[in-house]
Amino acid sequence: MSLATLDTTQHPNLPASSATLFSAKATKALSFEQIAQHIGRNEVATAAIFYGQAKASPEDIEKLSSLLDIDHETLKAQLSGFPDRGRSVEMPPKEPLIYRLYEIVQNYGYAYKAVLNEKFGDGIMSAISFSTKVEKETDEQGNNWAVITLRGKWLPFSRF
């Protein structure tokens, strides 16, 4: 199994906690799925903690510290603040997989908007009251497909 690692030279805007967490993840040879199961979170949410894009709860910090053998006080100091979301990726992104996600929004963004507006009215899909998951699907020919589910609360615009 290949594991996601971190090259800090490619991600200079990530918080110190990212290097700490990824180093311990590599040492323990754990996948995000395994770590997520241990802390009781979704694997994408777990990866978001590692990239400094999601807030870790005190319970998350305790469980990560224990699982990854990271000093609790060090991890608590690094993860107890509020995330500075959105700084980790330059726009447009250069990493090919992240660029494909960006490209999906470029190509289908207005189509999604039109369909969502027709179904829900004038509003937006929350990225705060939100969940996501990634699944692997294999078709009859043996081709692997990535299935990404985005689930956000619908927030109608207020009339004032």
Curated annotation (Swiss-Prot):
EC number: 4.2.1.104
Reaction catalyzed: cyanate + hydrogencarbonate + 3 H(+) = NH4(+) + 2 CO2
Active site as annotated: R100, E103, S126
CDD domains (alphabetical): Cyanase_C
GO molecular function per UniProt: cyanate hydratase activity; DNA binding
Class of enzymatic activity (EC top level): lyase
Key words, A-Z: Lyase
GO biological process: cyanate metabolic process
Pfam family, any one: Cyanate_lyase
Signal peptide range: none
Superkingdom of the source species: Eukaryota
InterPro entries linked: Cyanase, Cyanate_lyase_C, Cyanate_lyase_C_sf, Lambda_DNA-bd_dom_sf
Reported function: Catalyzes the reaction of cyanate with bicarbonate to produce ammonia and carbon dioxide.
UniProt family annotation: Belongs to the cyanase family.
Name this protein carries in UniProt: Cyanate hydratase
Gene: cyn1
